[in-house]
A protein has these predicted regions:
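Short alpha-helical elements
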Residues: 1-115
């Protein structure tokens, strides 16, 4: 668990300041995004047998928080990686994977507000 996620669990009232959306919105978004992610994953053409490959370092919820944190605060990917305990390139990859999906789920006004 990242320091940011731990902080948000401890102080949910600070979610708006840290991510640009409140804790209730984050919970709803996470639920919907996870479902959408699983749908996409099923449709994706697999190159490696199911169960193969390396496990992700961050859970899906942490990946969503990483993306929202970047959109709201604009740290470098190096700093983002340090905060979430992943490499700079992994932080970059996670951000771009989730950005596309979140753009579909969030209203344009909220995406602009986050940026």
């Amino acid at each position: 668990m990242s320091n940011i996620e731990e902080f948000l669990r401890q102080y949910p009232q600070e979610t708006q300041r840290v991510l640009g959306i409140n804790a209730e919105q984050l919970e709803k978004l996470t639920k919907i995004a996870k479902e959408k992610y699983q749908e996409r994953k099923k449709q994706k053409t697999r190159l490696i047998k199911a169960g193969g490959g390396r496990e992700a370092k961050l859970m899906l919820e942490e990946q969503i928080i990483l993306t929202l944190f970047y959109l709201h605060n604009f740290p470098t990917f190096q700093i983002l990686g340090i905060q979430f305990g992943v490499s700079e390139s992994t932080a970059h990859k996670i951000f771009h994977e989730w950005l596309e999906l979140l753009e579909e789920l969030l209203p344009a006004s909220l995406m602009e507000q986050l940026k």
